[in-house]
């Protein structure tokens, strides 16, 4: 670096070197190839020696003085130009554009001047060589020398042109960048300009001293040196000094500020991709290992051996590089999602069987591992219900309790569905299609869902999942057109709800409920307030159905109970009389089996008779409805007259009488079969098994739909229960809330009120009445809406305990 550089430029020396590598060190009119440059210098030196030995005395003082004067003039012009440039920048910092234009003009002018000097030197050399050729050496030697010099100069000019072009590009870049930094660097430019002037003066003095020393050396050999070569050294020195100054200026102009580099997008991208350097370091270590393994020493082996070894090493290195990249990609992708089967196509049925060779190399798991993951997901989801119920862990035995699903149960099912989506790599739509699919792939999907809520029946979970995760676009309000289409379909396919739902694009359960709750009754369905007569009729219908169920129970179970008593008596006799033969027990068992078989035959015969009677009654009811038709007005499928305003609301079905009779007969038959199964099972009658609200609606004359009858009955029962619980004693209330407290449950929906009522038969309260007691008494607790049932029960226990204590004291 020149001595005149300031501290800031010295600190940026590494950056300058980087710029010099880009711009080119050949700004001093030298070739890029250092070997070629050295060889040219040796040739010139040998030619000088030959010319000195063969030349005669030639007077070259005048030429030398003239060349020196030209060099001095060039230096003066350079210094004056720089001083003028710096002085203009010191006068007005705001005029930055003129300063840079002056630098560009000076650089172009200096370049043109240097080219002109090179052409003049070439012409002078050609003239002098022609004059001296007759006295010192032959014409052929001169031609050879001239050709060599010309080729070298041509090569040098080509290289210089390239370097000058690159330098001009660098100056242009610095020129553009410096426009943005003029205001921030004005003070620094003032100090730099003063130092540069001082450095230029020192450089000029050093160049004069150097030329003087060279002149002294040349004077000692002046008598033996060719006149053409007397100024060769001076010209080289002058060009070197000028090029050093020019290069320093270009380097300073082309250096990018450090702040600009850090804010450059490419530099930020380099920082963001720093993680990729780890792989490059690994590859570098592999390459170094190969170099050490194969002993590639280029200094001790010839070129052929080096080429062969290097080619072999390159092949092995490329192979190891591929292996390394493959291993790294596999390691990165070997996560939880990659080891699972791929997502199936949208066009195919969800969860098709995977082939055994499916992505074995990528680390996919087989069916056994998938099954383990699903079981683990079911266990985790089931734990949510256990945690939400605090100390009360749900029973693992399944029950037929049809209470509503609470938030904890829905959260557990949702947790399993999310895990299932991740394991099988399916979308939510594909999972819903899987739930509604009629196929049953061997993936234990439903079995694992049932494990999430082990205390609920499989049918209740199945229905709840299909309601919650449906695949239908429409749910909710029905339009008049949809109801008309539903009426047409039900007239043809009543009971085939899957096909009807598929046609309408709705859930089968929605179609079924809409038909029997609203559309089936048509305009005959009343929507006004229930009258007293309607309430009494509803009570009579339900009372008759309960009485019929009790009659069936009395006909079936007395014989069965009698046979069971005989069997128990036989067992007791066996224990008392150990000496009796086992034949007596066998004969008693055989007799009991024969009696049961005979009873079953009687039941089958009675069932057939009942079915025939029901069919006859339905036909008679249909015929009576048909006889009362008014031919002047349209009728619905039940034979009910329609007003003129309601003709468009219902579509008459063909063969209405036969369709209604068949539907009613099938409904009654299914109800009786269900009731008999309950009686044959445990001998107990459940209200939900006895009462079929469709039959209730039919016995009400079709004036109220099944859902209206059910809602009205629940209100009537609740009204009577509220009147009954008014007489419940504090001791019974204390017992109720102590049991609720001991259960440790947190949600109202987790209580089985019927089982709770069975724990104390003497209290004579059913499950509904116990629930009403709780709902009535919890309002006495302050902030009961924000408290759990367990917290409410604790406070009510304290409340009734204090009441009982006060009554006892009084």
From Swiss-Prot:
Residues 51-64, 124-135, 180-191, 586-606 have a biased composition (Low complexity). One of its GO terms (biological process) is positive regulation of transcription by RNA polymerase II. Pfam families: Myb_DNA-binding, Reb1_MybAD. Residues 497-519 bind DNA. Gene3D superfamilies: Homeodomain-like. Keywords: DNA-binding, Isopeptide bond, Nucleus, Phosphoprotein, Repeat, Transcription, Transcription regulation, Ubl conjugation. CDD domains: SANT. This is DNA-binding protein REB1.
